[in-house]
């Protein structure tokens, strides 16, 4: 009985500590950063036309960067331009969006365009706000299914190691890592089911986020330009092998 009481007491302490850290992470005074609509065009005027659509959250609106050209998918589009593509970008991303938001408001607008390339970067807010992973997977299934029907190629960004976020402190950081990993597994399954490609945010990308303090912006949550470069590298590694097939 004594050991059981001890375990119960320890559990209460852990839960209480996590709750305190969560409140601290949300309420501490940090700067609010500008966001961008990174729609636009890049590449030679006589290049191969390529329409890219973006479904996403703040990872695609760029709080933490100085200008839209530093956002990860704009960096990818610059590499496509170097390959001779004339890239037209239509971003439907909204900061704070969950998978349900993307499904309800972003997908209908995007699928009407019949894009050549679709980037899907939602799910992190689902993970952060404790949306059941079954719900996340169901929403992603529908998002990816609908976009693969109209888009020649679909890339799913996934969820990275949220435990690297400086705003979080232990033990919340460890919990964020575990839940982020589970969320990414859900994204990988959904991508595979529908023939989409998936970026790897848990290899070199996660290591960079863990070790490079310049990755994060002043709000200690969103990545700065170096973080977007890491994301662009991960997306390009997944995308580049498929370019000659399109």
Mark where each language-model region is:
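Alpha-helical cap/lid subdomain in secreted, periplasmic
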Residues: 104-245
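Short, mixed-charge, low-aromatic patches
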Residues: 28-38, 58-66, 95-101, 140-147, ...
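Short hydrophobic segments within beta-strands
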Residues: 55-56, 157
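Short amphipathic alpha-helical surface micro-motifs
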Residues: 35, 71-73, 180-181, 203
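N-terminal secretory targeting modules
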Residues: 1-53, 66, 83, 236, ...
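A generic structural signal for short, solvent-exposed coil/turn residues
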Residues: 44, 81-84, 148, 190
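Conserved SGNH/GDSL esterase-like catalytic core that processes O-acyl groups on lipids
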Residues: 51-53, 59-138
């Amino acid at each position: 009985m004594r050991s059981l009481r001890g375990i119960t007491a320890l559990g209460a302490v852990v839960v209480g500590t996590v709750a305190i850290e969560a409140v601290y992470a949300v309420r501490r005074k940090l700067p609010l950063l500008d966001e961008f609509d990174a729609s636009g065009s890049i590449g030679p005027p006589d290049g191969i036309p390529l329409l890219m659509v973006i479904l996403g959250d703040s990872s695609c609106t760029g709080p933490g960067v100085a200008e839209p050209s530093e956002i990860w998918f704009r960096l990818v589009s610059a590499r496509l331009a170097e390959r001779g593509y004339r890239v037209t970008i239509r971003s439907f991303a909204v900061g704070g969006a969950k998978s349900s938001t993307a499904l309800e408001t972003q997908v209908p607008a995007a699928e009407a365009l019949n894009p050549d390339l679709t980037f899907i970067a939602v799910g992190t807010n689902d993970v952060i706000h404790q949306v059941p992973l079954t719900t996340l997977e169901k929403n992603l299934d529908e998002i990816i299914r609908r976009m693969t029907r109209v888009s020649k190629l679909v890339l799913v960004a996934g969820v990275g190691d949220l435990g690297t976020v400086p705003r979080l402190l232990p033990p919340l950081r460890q919990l964020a890592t575990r839940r982020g990993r589970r969320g990414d597994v859900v994204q990988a399954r959904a991508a595979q089911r529908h023939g989409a490609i998936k970026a790897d945010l848990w290899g070199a990308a996660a290591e960079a986020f863990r070790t490079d303090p310049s990755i994060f912006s002043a709000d200690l949550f969103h990545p700065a330009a170096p973080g977007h470069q890491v994301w662009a590298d991960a997306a390009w590694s997944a995308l580049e092998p498929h370019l000659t097939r399109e």
